[in-house]
């Protein structure tokens, strides 16, 4: 809209303005100006019912401080602190570590089981799974579920086992998936029906076995506070609900990265840059984690790792 600029924003953050809404609500006020405004005024509603704020309750944010990839609507003090964190660190986490998505069956009531449950097919065709409720800050994450997993490693790739091989080597599994063929084919992947694919008996998202097997950091995708955990069980994890972080630099240990991710400074940064959802939960995307300002100090690494191990 030509010559129209946002003048004020009233942010309801995670307050339950609409029943069932998961994203937060804001009110934008626009006005027409012949020249661009220098500032936008922002107010965060502390509680409901909503009381119209006075002009003095709004904080002033310079338009020049707003970036194209996303607006950080914070006070000048918070914005300066975030900028200082970025300028003081030479790298971002992505240089040393990588985020990974997990496995998604598309039909948990058919393909997911309790960890100790006896499944109606060969147990060799399952893999343990870590769920969000298994993650606690600095703790070892333990799998509480297992899923049907018809995949094998081919070099560094994870490939779907041919249906004929499943029939020959895992007859109970073959019988089980054929029994549920109609249900499995009805699953959708990006709005496309799974039955249209040759690999209809696979998972919607299957992850990567080589990354599952590595020592890794796991965390729920939506949290109120950082609760990065360590997984040494070689388990898969639920895509969308849990993500993992692995070290991609042999000199930087997973324990060092874990200490960084669970630090108060890292939590402060994420809580001021990640998307906020209803109930006070922050959504940690791979982009949010990858772009964290990060510094590796080899002189302190051994002491940091020792502290993490002894927690």
Segments the model singles out, each with a brief description of its role:
Residues 308-311:
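Short, intrinsically disordered, charge-balanced linker/junction segments flanking boundaries
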Residues 1-113, 239-242, 282-288:
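Signature of N6-adenine DNA methyltransferases within the class I
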Residues 74-303:
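Polybasic, glycine- and aromatic-enriched phosphate-binding surface used to engage nucleic acids
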